[in-house]
Regions:
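Switch/coupling sub-region of P-loop NTPases
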Residues: 1-96
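Active-site lining segments that contact anionic ligands and/or coordinate catalytic metals
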Residues: 12, 63, 100-104, 120-123
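Active-site donor-binding loop signature of nucleotide-sugar glycosyltransferases
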Residues: 17-19, 109, 127-130
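Short flexible/disordered coil segments
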Residues: 35, 56-62, 101-109, 133-134, ...
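Cys/His-rich Zn2+-binding cysteine-cluster or related metal-binding knuckle/ribbon modules and their
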Residues: 82-104, 108-116
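NTP-binding/hydrolysis catalytic cores, primarily Walker-type P-loop NTPases
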Residues: 115-166
Length: 166
């Protein structure tokens, strides 16, 4: 999808860059940041290099939208950490992720017998933030239960303040 957005939205200011054996995640994200975009869409975070490139980009104030394979939204920070190949301090890494990643959304896909087609559903939405004492925190604001019911909680003041600034 991300490589075709310029064709889907021809009147939008979109630049698509693909990584390969010459241009790495780091190279591509540095090039993107030089263009000062509002958003960077990274197809998938699946390597230590991608994790570090994303972390460096978001900590410099750039907004990134990406995907990652995780069992639920609330486990995304630890999933990012598990992709690292270094012995970086887990507490420091998680604090950085909680400071700069506002939301994670878990989408599950399945074959719907009722609809006779592949279906995707949002299963969990989790916000991340660092509180007044600099502690990394998370708040699951939506979760769909196996039985079909769901749980909804209010977002924190941190997410509301962030959204007000956007």
């Amino acid at each position: 999808l991300e490589l075709h957005l310029d064709r889907i939205y021809p009147n939008r200011d979109i630049v698509a860059i693909k990584t390969n054996n010459i241009a790495s995640y780091t190279d591509v994200l540095v090039t993107c940041m030089r263009q000062n975009p509002k958003w960077i869409l990274l197809s998938e975070v699946r390597s230590a290099e991608a994790v570090m490139a994303v972390r460096n980009s978001i900590s410099s104030g750039h907004n990134i939208l990406s995907t990652i394979h995780a069992d639920k939204a609330s486990s995304v920070p630890m999933r990012l950490y598990s992709l690292l190949e270094s012995n970086q301090d887990v507490g420091q890494f998680l604090a950085t992720i909680h400071r700069y990643v506002q939301l994670a959304i878990c989408v599950k896909g399945y074959m719907s017998k009722e609809l006779g087609r592949f279906q995707r559903e949002i299963m969990e939405v989790c916000e991340f933030y660092v509180d007044e004492n600099n502690n990394p925190c998370s708040n699951v604001i939506y979760r769909k239960n196996i039985g079909g019911g769901f749980v909804i909680k209010n977002p924190s003041k941190y997410l509301l303040e962030y959204l007000d600034l956007q």
